[in-house]
Structure formats: C-alpha cells, structure tokens
Amino acid sequence: MVRTKANYVPGAYRKAVASQAPRKVLGSSTFVTNSSSSSRKAENKYAGGNPVCVRPTPKWQKGIGEFFRLSPKESKKENQAPEEAGTSGLGKAKRKACPLQPDHRDDENE
C-alpha cells in the first residue's frame, strides 16, 4: 500500500509490505503447465527426510512392553549375580571391602 500526504499521520511508522522473490524459470512457458501436474505427483510421493521401511518383528525379539512388565523375580533371571554384573569374567576372585582407617596425624599438627 502506498501512503500519500493525505493519509500521513505524524509519528506513524511505514508499513513494510512483504512480497515473494521472483523464481527462476529454467524453460519456456512449458514450465507453467508442468508445475500443476508435478504438484499432484508431489502429494503422493514422500517429501523427504528419513524414509520408513516397516518390517515384521522376528519371533525371538521381545516386545517393548515386556521390559515394563517384568516382575522382580523375572529381572533376577537376567543378572544371576548382580555384584558381578559389570565384570568381564576375567578376575573372578572375591575382594573384601577394606574401609580406610581414619588418619589422626593431620589433626595433631593443626
């Protein structure tokens, strides 16, 4: 919209009107006729991103719901010895926990 002096209001800002940039035409007028048919094809075709390929789930694979429904008895079956769950099986020797004795020598110097 173009403002004239007749509708000028002091202190009002100018309104910017957005418009589209001109598009490059790679061919002649045939581009215009083909654009309508290509837009119909684009509706049926996947537009981009990661395509999804749905495959059947193998019989041996557990469903996601199985992990949420496990009772405490069933969860112990997977980890027979929970204290050795992080070991690789190379060092099976049991270690005793030896708590450190408090060091009172530092207290005497202060």
Swiss-Prot record:
Renumbered ranges of motif D-box: 23-34
Listed Low complexity bias regions: 28-39
Record InterPro entries: PCNA-AF (IPR040444), PCNA-AF_dom (IPR031444)
Modified residues (N6-acetyllysine): K24
Compositional bias segments (type: Basic and acidic residues): 71-80
Sites bearing Phosphoserine, chain numbering: S28, S71
Its job: PCNA-binding protein that acts as a regulator of DNA repair during DNA replication. Following DNA damage, the interaction with PCNA is disrupted, facilitating the interaction between monoubiquitinated PCNA and the translesion DNA synthesis DNA polymerase eta (POLH) at stalled replisomes, facilitating the bypass of replication-fork-blocking lesions. Also acts as a regulator of centrosome number.
Subunit and partners: Interacts (when monoubiquitinated at Lys-15 and Lys-24) with PCNA. Interacts with isoform 2/p33ING1b of ING1. Interacts with BRCA1.
Protein name in UniProt: PCNA-associated factor
Species whose genome carries this gene: Mus musculus (Mouse)
